[in-house]
């Protein structure tokens, strides 16, 4: 059976696409991944900049609610990884880690992004506890502190500039000499 739509990814963009597609009666299939559905917000303690949550909401709670909403409208949720895609032609082919193949007329890729880690000791352990990858999301928590931004491109300079609104001092560290 050829499906109307396959969505790859289970962060806010993936679930939002699933909710809208289901309500439009496109009967979407959504691949959530085999490890943890919900994307990067699953490791975020409190989300304070999501509309509608005046007092904030825990990242995992928000993502579970989005997942339930997508399912309620009829999205077929598959907890597996996509290992192969052929997106050429009118019919797209998606193969998952279990060897199942789904064909669809359209595919939405909503896999999010991965932050580039710098390899510091305890970097993973301190994520969300002083180590951050999002100035807009977390700058507020570092008011009147010295903040270091690691990077040398436009994004690093942009983040450092934004953080001057909160920090007592911003240090920009470039990776290369």
Predicted regions and their residues:
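Glycine/Thr-rich phosphate-binding loops of Rossmann-like dinucleotide-binding domains
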Residues: 16, 38, 117-118, 158
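Glycine-rich beta-alpha-beta "Rossmann" dinucleotide-binding loop(s) and their flanking helix/strand
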Residues: 98, 107, 111-134
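Rossmann-like dinucleotide/flavin-binding elements
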Residues: 2, 7-33, 127, 133-177
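N-terminal Rossmann-like dinucleotide/flavin-binding domain of flavoprotein oxidoreductases
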Residues: 42-101
């Amino acid at each position: 059976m050829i499906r109307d739509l396959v969505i790859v990814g289970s962060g806010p963009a993936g679930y939002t696409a699933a909710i809208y597609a289901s309500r439009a009666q496109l009967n979407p299939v959504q691949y959530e991944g085999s490890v943890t559905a919900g994307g990067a917000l699953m490791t975020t303690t409190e989300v304070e900049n999501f509309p509608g949550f005046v007092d904030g909401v825990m990242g995992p709670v928000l993502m579970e609610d989005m997942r339930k909403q997508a399912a309620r409208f009829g999205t077929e949720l598959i907890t597996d990884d996509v290992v192969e895609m052929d997106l050429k032609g009118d019919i797209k082919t998606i193969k998952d880690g279990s060897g199942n193949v789904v064909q669809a007329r359209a595919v939405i890729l909503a896999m999010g992004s991965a932050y580039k880690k710098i390899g510091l000791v305890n970097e993973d352990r301190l994520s969300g506890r002083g180590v951050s990858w999002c100035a807009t999301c977390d700058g507020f928590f570092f008011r009147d502190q010295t903040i270091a931004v690691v990077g040398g491109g436009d994004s690093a300079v942009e983040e450092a500039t934004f953080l001057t609104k909160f920090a007592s001092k911003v240090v920009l560290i470039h990776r290369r000499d």
